[in-house]
Amino acid sequence: MTIGKILLYYCFTPIEDPTAIMLWQRSLCEKLGLKGRILISEHGINGTVGGDMDACKRYVRETREYPGFKKMEFKWSEGGAEDFPRLSVKVRDEIVAFGAPGELKVDENGVIGGGVHLKPEEVNKLVEERGEEVVFFDGRNAMEAEIGKFKNAVVPDVRTTHDFIAELESGKYDWMKDKPVVSYCTGGIRCEILSALMKNRGFNEVYQIDGGIVRYGEKYGNDGLWEGSMYVFDKRMHHEFGQGLEDPGFIQLGHCVHCGKGTNTFHNCINEDTCRKQVLICDDCIQHVETQHCGRPDCAEVAASQAQA
């Protein structure tokens, strides 16, 4: 019986010919039977792929043969190719779509001018030394924080990474500009860019967590500053640390929009024409068509009409 694994990785490094790297990566993944999503730009590579563990090991070895990716870190998690609908390898202007390709600068050491990297234990030390002065700033989409975030974190009202620049320039967060700000995201890639954007806009003391929530959760489980589940962009939808949902230290943050029952599972609103918003709906409520909506009155009407059909 084969064992499946999922790889999460990124690397910021100058790439002269992104198309050539794209073709090589696509061929490599097809040869190894991997599925997932890989984005490549002149700034680097960003990928999540899944497949047989031996195939994943070979993928890591062969990908690191490219000089710019030699030191790239790969994060391993449970899962496999079945967690992805297909293989997608594409060239983009940005490997994370903040809408600022001209602002991002990279060299062989990574992003130029980004926030200071902190290991998980250094994050805890910073909080111990400076207490409530420290601000955790969520670098993900606001929806992701509904099921998990750092304790007392500031969660910007953004639906996509494209919204961050306008949000930072809105003045809402000027009170943070002279405070120690710890930016965080799933695996660290979004905060590589976000922390640089923040520094460019006058935030004076910006940090980022090395390896993101993934590494912090692996280190501390449910006994640190992280609360709840981590949203993931594959069929699993969410990931728990430590002993999972049964861990004595686990804090349930996500709740069904209809009945309030604890849940970490997102579903698309039934109103496919004008909504499709992802919302938390528990296993019981999702069984009934009339509660397969986001809660908006017009979406509730769509659900009700389909239930009667």
From Swiss-Prot:
Q: Which reaction does it catalyse?
A: uridine(34) in tRNA + AH2 + O2 = 5-hydroxyuridine(34) in tRNA + A + H2O
Show the disulfide pairing: none
Biological process annotations from GO: tRNA modification
What's its EC?
Answer: 1.14.-.-
Q: Which residues form the Rhodanese domain?
A: 130-225
Q: Which SMART domains match?
A: RHOD
Q: Name one Pfam family in it.
A: Rhodanese
Q: Which PROSITE patterns match?
A: RHODANESE_3
Catalytic residues per the record? C185
> Which top EC class is given?
oxidoreductase
Q: Which CDD domains match?
A: RHOD_YceA
**Is tRNA processing found in the keyword set?**
yes
Functional note: Catalyzes oxygen-dependent 5-hydroxyuridine (ho5U) modification at position 34 in tRNAs.
Q: What is the protein's given name? A: tRNA uridine(34) hydroxylase
Q: Which organism is it from?
A: Corynebacterium aurimucosum (strain ATCC 700975 / DSM 44827 / CIP 107346 / CN-1) (Corynebacterium nigricans)
> Taxonomy-wise, where does this protein's organism fall, top ranks first?
Bacteria, Bacillati, Actinomycetota, Actinomycetes, Mycobacteriales
Q: Which gene encodes it?
A: trhO
